[in-house]
Design a protein with these regions (language model features):
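Rossmann-like dinucleotide/flavin-binding elements
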Residues: 1-7, 68, 109
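Flexible, acidic loop-helix segments that line cofactor/substrate-binding pockets
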Residues: 2-18
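Flexible, glycine-rich terminal cap/loop adjacent to redox cofactors
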Residues: 14-117
Length: 117
């Protein structure tokens, strides 16, 4: 089974803090003519980040305002390398924000930040 290598969808930079990103960014979405909504949540409000003593950073998603489809996401902070994969799936499968909001995240986990978006 052959697949094409799609470099733009490699979602992680292993750094400190960790960075995860997928899909399109705000600027690119606007350049492409999308009417967008930007939703952002901070790790300062994340219980797992508080427990681990590393509550800096945020998660952000870019949503098409007309269709509700998730166009992109950026996560900077603890757990970003693991959390971003959920967003890669959402972007690749063109999941709508209302569908995404129905996903349950265990408590306390870093991925709970996505429930706040």
């Amino acid at each position: 089974h052959r697949t094409e290598f799609d470099q733009p969808e490699i979602p992680v930079v292993f750094s400190n803090p960790a960075i995860g990103s997928c899909g399109i960014k705000e600027k690119e979405a606007k350049e492409k003519g999308f009417d967008i909504e930007v939703k952002k949540a901070f790790f300062k409000a994340n219980p797992k980040a508080k427990i681990e003593g590393d509550d800096s950073g945020f998660a952000k998603i870019i949503v098409c305002a007309n269709s509700g489809v998730i166009l992109g996401s950026s996560i900077i902070g603890a757990g970003a390398a693991e959390i971003i994969h959920e967003m890669v799936l959402a972007v690749e499968k063109k999941i709508k924000i209302e569908e995404f909001k129905g996903i349950i995240h265990a408590h306390p986990t870093f991925s709970e930040i996505l429930s706040s978006l």
